Amino acid sequence: MKKKQILVCGTGFGKIYLKAIAESKEYELMGILGKGSDRSRLLSKNLNVPMYTDIKEINQNVDAACVVVPNAAGGGNGANIAKSILAKGIPTLLEHPAHEVEIVNCIRESGSAAFMLNPFYRYIKPIRDFLEAAQIISKHAHLINASLECAIHVLYDGIDILGCALGGLSTWKLGNVAESYTTSMAGGGNRVISGIIGMVPVTFIVNTNVDRNDIDHPCLLYTSPSPRD
């Protein structure tokens, strides 16, 4: 079976894509699109593929492109690069996060070419194991609370993973759960308090769910991650 020819744009986080493609039995790297930095040129040399600095230079068949360049939120122009590639009729995978306007513009430009924002974290083994466990638990118990704690870099992924664990994000509301009249859990949920102890920023996330039939049985005892630089 002939391998699919993949173009990768960006070699920062893009090196993760390059490694995955190099190890794949289904895909083959056909080139790197970048600004021509020493890093990009070294990678193209080591991987024995062409180095492109302009999308117009690409004149051979490309089955798909991966744009791994920051979008506007990260101070980059990844979405614009994706639009240029889509305009050539090349199916394109865009790294997140991306603003909704950027996504809509890419879809508008795509025509018949496939376009997708990459939610790859849900496919890596630790997350797959977590989602499988969540699915099993949901068959045997009623979920009463969910929490997400993550870095801003992976907030989009975190929301996607949470949605997969909960079975979807089709109905949602931001705000205090206790003030929501649409949920049977009014009065429950998490309360968040931020402050400083000494010179350390702290966040208290307090779960307020109480089982009236067993008030001494909390659904959460303690969790206290302490990131260090």
Which residues does each predicted region cover?
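N-terminal Rossmann-like dinucleotide-binding module
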Residues: M1-L47
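A general structural motif
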Residues: K3, L29, V62, A87-G89, ...
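A contiguous active-site-proximal alpha/beta segment in oxidoreductase catalytic domains
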Residues: L93, A98-I161
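Rossmann-like dinucleotide-binding domain that binds NAD(P)(H)
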Residues: L143-P218
